[in-house]
Amino acid sequence: ANSGYGDSMNHGLEMARGKYVGILESDDFMAPDALEKLVSAADSNNADFAKANFDFYWSKPEERRSLHEMFRPRDCGKPVHPSDTTQFFKQKPSIWSAVYRRDFLERNGITFLPTPGASFQDTSFAFKVIACADKAIYLHDAVLSYRQDNENSSVNSSAKVFCVNTEYAEIERWIREDYARDHASDD
């Protein structure tokens, strides 16, 4: 039975055994060297995660791509503390154009909200990653093609437009309960 995106992702995180975790959704595709670039950048900078730009991709009526440039060249190639600027909290979550150190996710209890039938479940995951990371590295290269013409995609369902509210409620709960508790001595 399909228990939903968040629950499925959490099962994947529980089963993961490698140093890094990457996410690829079924209707998208990665550049052949995407994981090599992301892991190399994360490893060489001892980063909690490495994240890159991506392309919007259409296959109909003809194939075309458009770079979604979240990170400008000046922001790339050097380690940053992602929560030092609000810029990164405002970006499209795009959790699939990144790799995350598995021990970082586990240490911070970062998982997905397991709400069956929901959408936007990458929203709270991405927020928690940015808030908890001590070091990130951004790449200018587009490493993933994010398909825009899948009519069955949950982001194209008007019935699911309010699901993002559940994600924002989870962010608020997490800040109040988990983040505040775990970072009380950071002042």
State what each model feature region is.
Residues 5, 9, 26-140, 144-161:
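Donor-binding/catalytic cores of nucleotide-activated saccharide
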Residues 16, 38, 168-171:
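Tetratricopeptide repeat
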